[in-house]
């Protein structure tokens, strides 16, 4: 008996030493041989933004598969749907009267082009109306004009700037005036009889030559760039400074004119993909640890923090694990999802198309929301998540975990990022939520989401965290519990909330 006990203790000691050595090697590789800056340059500077349906999205998928193959990691493209193919080329906007000035802005995603020589026209702003009849009467006068469809912002300074320098009375007055103006604008829009989605079509059908918008993101020099709703005329987003200048000129009767030359290509129907790569497990190859990050982006910037940084974390984690942990117990699979921005489509397609993998998944680690170090992990509503996630976190270096707050069992995410696709299917999927770094105002879906906003020290920290979590989840002797929490009562309805339901992806988009 003593002999057997000695053998068992020796095995535990050797196994523990082996784990410690592997973890040390993982941390050293992630720290001293980081490839993050180079990967970021190739993805963000050279390939650029990754709007679904664009050639750049396909180029990014091909780049990722080749990169994985160069590291000795088998990879493939998972075709899950089709999308409207489109390519942004260029936008040139100039004020030509009452003076000459180049304006700053761009066409929205999937916007139609102008003709080769562009279009020059006067501008009009949305009128104050009492009802739909008045608005329809106004529409008769927009033929041959650009229509400025968004509210003129009362200030181009973000609230934090006001709070720092304004008197309290001035700050409060500005906020009240802005709130009153916003409420009046929305009420007026309702009186037109159209919504934010349908009013573009009404303006286009009335003969306008283009729509000018300005979706300010409440920060210096930042606008959010989404998609056009027009079919034949361009939709152009102007930065706040130029938009409000033109708006004032219209109000004061200065009759400004602008010239717009916007170029883009319609590419028909194109396939959409996920990039999948895996390090095959040696003991339990049919059980999976999944690393998750959406690959697509909006295209106002280059998609650096949404979600270039999440992509980089998962790619670098796979590189490090392949180098220092090439024979994992369980298969470690990475998914770079397409079309997250249009509704988690890529990850929902994966969950739907690979039910066996989903059924045998140990854990999913997802990273999406920005460049900052991870500061929050919650248990996603899984009752026993505390037991295994906390155990895994204990092996992460303290200088990484000291920033992290955990909450268990947490609550299941119904949307927001790709972890929700797995949670809905009952898989323990954890979002590695990061520090803000002014994400929502300055980089989330904006024209300023670019390489220079990345905090590489924080991203390196996230690689270490993700690599250690993946290693520990792979090595764990036990399979994770999927027992769910009892859902709480909704305070508004008085009814018990339900677990999020699995949804099918949109497999034909923009058509």
Where in the sequence are the language-model features?
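N-terminal signal peptide c-region/cleavage motif recognized by signal peptidases
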Residues: 13-15
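N-terminal hydrophobic or amphipathic helices/low-complexity stretches enriched
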Residues: 17-59, 66-74, 160, 279-283, ...
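N-terminal capping segment at the start of a domain
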Residues: 20-54, 80, 90, 218-228, ...
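Soluble metallo-hydrolase cores and metallopeptidase-like ectodomains found primarily
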Residues: 21-22, 111-136, 220, 225-304, ...
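Noncatalytic luminal/extracellular "stalk/propeptide" segments of secretory-pathway proteins
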Residues: 32, 41, 45-179
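Short helix-loop-beta-strand segments that form the rim/entrance of peptidase-like active sites
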Residues: 38, 320-345, 364
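Metal-dependent peptidase/peptidase-like ectodomains
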Residues: 100, 116, 121, 140-144, ...
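His/Asp/Glu-rich mid-to-C-terminal helical/loop segments that flank catalytic regions of hydrolases
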Residues: 234-238, 248, 319, 439-511
């Amino acid at each position: 008996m003593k002999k057997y006990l000695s053998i068992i203790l020796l095995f535990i000691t050797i196994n523990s030493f082996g784990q410690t050595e592997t973890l040390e090697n993982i941390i050293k590789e992630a720290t001293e041989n980081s490839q993050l800056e180079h990967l970021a340059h190739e993805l963000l500077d050279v390939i650029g933004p990754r709007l679904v349906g664009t050639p750049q999205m396909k180029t990014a998928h091909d780049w990722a598969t080749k990169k994985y193959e160069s590291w000795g990691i088998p990879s493939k493209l998972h075709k899950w749907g089709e999308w409207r193919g489109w390519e942004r080329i260029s936008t040139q906007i100039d004020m030509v009267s009452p003076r000459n000035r180049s304006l700053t802005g761009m066409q929205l995603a999937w916007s139609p082009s102008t003709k080769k020589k562009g279009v020059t026209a006067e501008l009009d702003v949305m009128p104050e109306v009492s009802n739909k009849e008045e608005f329809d009467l106004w529409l008769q006068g927009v033929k041959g004009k650009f229509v400025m469809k968004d509210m003129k912002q009362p200030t181009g300074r973000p609230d934090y700037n006001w709070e720092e320098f304004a008197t309290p009375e001035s700050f409060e007055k500005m906020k009240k005036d802005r709130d009153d103006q916003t409420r009046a604008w929305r009420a007026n829009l309702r009186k037109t009889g159209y919504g934010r989605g349908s009013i573009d079509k009404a303006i286009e059908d009335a003969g306008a030559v283009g729509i000018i918008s300005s979706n300010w993101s409440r920060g210096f020099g930042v606008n959010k760039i989404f998609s056009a709703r027009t079919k034949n005329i361009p939709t152009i987003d102007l930065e706040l400074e130029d938009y409000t200048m033109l708006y004032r000129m219209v109000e004061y009767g200065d009759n400004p004119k602008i010239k717009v030359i916007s170029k883009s290509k319609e590419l028909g129907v194109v396939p959409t993909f996920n990039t999948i790569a895996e390090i095959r497990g040696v003991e339990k190859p049919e059980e999976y640890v999944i690393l998750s990050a959406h690959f697509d982006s909006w295209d106002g910037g280059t998609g650096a923090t949404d979600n270039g940084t999440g992509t980089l974390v998962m790619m670098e984690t796979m590189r490090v694990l392949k180098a220092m942990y090439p024979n994992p117990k369980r298969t470690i699979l990475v998914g770079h999802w397409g079309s997250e921005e249009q509704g988690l489509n890529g990850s929902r397609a994966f969950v739907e198309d690979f039910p066996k993998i989903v059924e045998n998944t140990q854990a999913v680690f997802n990273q999406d929301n920005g460049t900052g170090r991870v500061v929050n992990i919650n248990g996603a509503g899984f009752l026993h998540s505390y037991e295994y996630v906390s155990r895994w976190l204990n092996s992460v270096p303290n200088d990484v975990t000291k920033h992290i707050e955990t909450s268990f069992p947490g609550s299941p995410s119904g949307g927001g990022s790709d972890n929700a696709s797995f949670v809905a299917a009952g898989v323990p999927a954890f979002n590695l939520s990061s520090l803000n770094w002014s994400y929502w105002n300055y980089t989330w879906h904006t024209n300023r989401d670019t390489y220079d906003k990345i905090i590489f020290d924080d991203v390196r920290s996230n690689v270490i965290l993700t690599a250690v979590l993946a290693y520990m989840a792979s090595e764990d002797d036990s399979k994770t519990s999927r027992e769910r929490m009892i859902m709480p009562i909704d305070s508004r309805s008085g009814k018990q909330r339900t677990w999020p339901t699995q949804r099918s992806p949109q497999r034909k988009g923009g058509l």
